[in-house]
Amino acid sequence: MTDAITIIGGGLAGCEAVWQAAERGVRVTLHEMKPHAFSPAHHLAGLAELVCSNSLRGESLENAVGLLKEELRRAGSLIMAAADATRVPAGGALAVDRELFSAFVTERIENHPLVDLMRGEVADIPSEDIVIVATGPLTSDGLAERIRAITGPNLYFYDAIAPIVTAESLDMTKVFRASRYGKGDGDDYLNCPLNQEEYEGFVDAILAAEKVPARDFEKVVHFEGCMPVEEMAERGRETLRFGPLKPVGLADPRTGEEPHAVVQLRAENREGTMFNLVGFQTKLTYPEQRRIFRMIPGLENAEFVRLGSMHRNTFINAPALLAPTFQLKGDARILFAGQITGVEGYVESAGSGFLAGVNAARLVRGEEPVVPPLATALGALVTHITNADVKHFQPMNVNYGLFPPLEGKVKKKERRGKLAERALAELDRWIGTV
């Protein structure tokens, strides 16, 4: 074993792992296949490309993902520094300009004196170095075969990408600005109200639409947080109205009442020239997307700069294969990080990369790997991912249901605040030791 670390994959997890290891004085080689090869879902040449939504979800500590963000900020996360520096208006959420975000991370990685960035596809895992595999949900076929030889079969499912429209193509006479319950600046989202007749027609069109078929060998298992819009419609006619099209907290200023349903558009860039359709990940064919999404009031003449699409997501059976340190049980010099471990979400991926990077650096220095305290958001997530039911393991977002209970009686409305307070105190004590 050498004193070097090899990291495969320049996504959020890989870049966070690189940063943490290099900042601890260890030389790191990062392998990223772009721009020599692109997956079907990637378009930017830079590192840390966001391929699904441009939102890192809620900021409030009332949400576990908000707590995880704060933990990572306190721990010196590169991904959180990039997100804070490139944010765009998004109400109570943290959304970013994805091109600026990628550029920020790329510049930091390229200019770190202890990082060697190697552009090109990798088809094998080094046999001597400490290695972090952070190849993400779109692992190349060659490397996937090598990983499969080490870990056994992977399970495939699809994530889904939402369409983006230009702001200038929208009919603003039919759209109103507002954030749900007035959060954020109060007008961060564009809202397209639908009456009952419009909603029913929209659902009918989605249900009858032509979809891109999955290939026979690919098992389709959708994670709830990125469910295709047509899949939701198939669950029931009201599902969309209680999901991404829910109107609660969004009174139409022209009527003073909540519409029957609302399609929300969120800024895709700082300039506000592009908006994505929130929750509209889809595997509808491109012609059907143009036809059906232009049924939405205000989008009749929408110009689509990107249409929705589906891409494969590959993840290992983490509880069977990984220790809580993210080391492979069968070969402790190999660590995994990111969505390939079964964490779901940008922030969760960054968190797993943080821990993998810290532990890889500790291995180089001859120190014992560490696990975050269970009471922290990162610790609760890591513990779940590596200790879940092996037979029924599925990807998981961070959530307060993963946390150990508080001691004593706590009022329900105070519970999350107390969990967050405890977590940050534990995090502050722990981070000084790693």
Curated annotation (Swiss-Prot):
Coiled-coil region(s): none
E.C. no: 2.1.1.74
Reactions listed under catalytic activity: uridine(54) in tRNA + (6R)-5,10-methylene-5,6,7,8-tetrahydrofolate + NADH + H(+) = 5-methyluridine(54) in tRNA + (6S)-5,6,7,8-tetrahydrofolate + NAD(+); uridine(54) in tRNA + (6R)-5,10-methylene-5,6,7,8-tetrahydrofolate + NADPH + H(+) = 5-methyluridine(54) in tRNA + (6S)-5,6,7,8-tetrahydrofolate + NADP(+)
Pfam families, alphabetized: GIDA
Cofactor entry: FAD
UniProt: FAD binding residues: G9, G10, G11, L12, A13, G14
Role this protein plays: Catalyzes the folate-dependent formation of 5-methyl-uridine at position 54 (M-5-U54) in all tRNAs.
Protein name: Methylenetetrahydrofolate--tRNA-(uracil-5-)-methyltransferase TrmFO
Lineage, uppermost ranks: Bacteria, Pseudomonadati, Thermodesulfobacteriota, Desulfuromonadia, Geobacterales
